[in-house]
Amino acid sequence: MLFPGCRSRALSSLCFCVLVLACVVACQQEGPGGTSSPSPEPASSSWSLVPGKMKEWMESLVTRTRESWQWFWGPRAFQGFVQTFYDDHLGDLGSHTQAWLHSSKDSLLNKAYDLCPQLLCRDSYWD
């Protein structure tokens, strides 16, 4: 559920979650000896070679990207990123959430008061 007026915060939180998920997947895929692609099997037609070539191309792309971003996967750099992200985007979320809860409570009470007949709901009850 998105809080009114906090869509940019929700989007930044979603991007952060996707980034963390990508980090976890990349760390899990990395084995102790690195990734090695199996040797391609002989194929009967040239079209059957396409999936193998695509897989080989993607594995090399992922490996090169992982190697060039190795500094980012380290715990020190990632911890610094998380701390900066929290300070920039999530640090004052508690005060925003409290303000939203108070405004929602007031709005809900006003709607309930409007629906309540005058004979059942006296002014002294709501004060």
UniProtKB/Swiss-Prot annotation:
Chief location category: secreted
GO biological process: lipid storage; lipid transport; positive regulation of triglyceride storage; triglyceride homeostasis
Any one GO CC term of the record: very-low-density lipoprotein particle
Residues of the signal peptide: 1-27
Keyword terms: Lipid transport, Secreted, Signal, Transport
Compartments where located: Secreted
Top-level taxonomic group: Eukaryota
Sequence similarity: Belongs to the apolipoprotein C4 family.
Role: May participate in lipoprotein metabolism.
Protein name, entry field: Apolipoprotein C-IV
Gene: APOC4
